[in-house]
Amino acid sequence: MPGRITKTLALFLSFAIFAVTILSAQSPTPPSQPATGPGGKQYVNASVTKNRYGKAGEEYWIFEPAEPKPASAPVIVFLHGWGGMNPLYYGAWIDHLVKRGNIVIYPRYQLNLLTPIREFMPNTLTAIKDALARLRTEPGHVKPDLTKFAAVGHSLGGVLAANVAALASESGLPRVLAVMSVEPGITEPPINVPLADLKKIPPEALLLAIAGDQDTLVRDVDAKRIYKESTRVPANNKDFITLVSDSHGQPGLIASHRAPTAFDLAYDSGEGIGGGPAEVLGGNRGGSDSAGGSDRAGGLPTRRIDGSREGRPDRLETMMVNALDFYGTWKLFDGLCDAAFYGKNREYALGNTPQQRFMGVWSDGVPVKELKVTDKP
């Protein structure tokens, strides 16, 4: 009798797995990365040069465009979420930004999970200033174009990005022309991440505050606060945007708090996923490494999780790269920087335009749910 029950259970499980597989195969798939335009895979550089400097909470990485190596390039400060000290968590996004011709500075700002919050902003500013000085004076680097300076951050880094824009002038940093805070938080008790006086953000800056409709961790509280408190930035230079989840196909597009992460092992600092202080302290601080990063022109390497393809690892499914990146955060920030630096592609980032709201099309021709854009959050 037990043997018969076991066989029956095994048969049932096999049928269930088969049914799920067939159902998944019949489900529409999400859009892949567009060929051109903001968020697209038309890159001006084929590889990325990676350098790591500093120590403890003042450590930072510099990622520079290569193949070909430009004489100069705009500078983007990328600020990770709490605990995201390892660049691998945002590696695919960093790769995208650098191959578009930008230098990316990635401040660590916290040695480990025990670093006091009060140290985050001083560590960030120190790292940025040191990185810019190194880029300007140390041989072999791409020269930083300090007239084209931007900041982007996710979660706690979204608050820090807004702070960088507000404190740039008094801190001796270049003027921030574009700033995007993605699912920022948390300035409320008991976390109490300090938020600078955002009235100091100059009116010529372009600003986006972004929330996810399934972000149950930070919600939209601080995104709204950043939008509302940046009072000198006129409404036509900023937008409040909500990423909208869509489960029309498989895998679904879920705008959770982890949606903006973009896992890529090519950007692993050596600490791995959730690496501790022991690995951090044992790492190289000044070596360089040129690597091709994620090749989006052909087959995507397994080191990067792509949500538009099958076989995503369940453990890291919330860090997959998908249309919420290509048509959401990546497109928006590309357009914002293009508008601020070169006076083009503004319609992809600002103004509640069709290009800004568009999120691609499922494989069955159904449009992905559009972004929600407002200037009255």
Region spans (language model):
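Gly/Ser-rich "nucleophile elbow"/oxyanion-hole loop immediately N-terminal to the catalytic nucleophile
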Residues: E67-A71, R118-L156
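Bacterial N-terminal signal peptides
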Residues: A10-T21
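Short glycine-enriched nucleophile-adjacent loop
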Residues: G158-E170
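The feature captures the conserved acid-bearing segment of alpha/beta-hydrolase catalytic domains
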Residues: P174-L253
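Short beta-strand element of the alpha/beta-hydrolase
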Residues: S72-G81
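Short amphipathic alpha-helix adjacent to the substrate-entry channel of hydrolases
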Residues: L88-I105
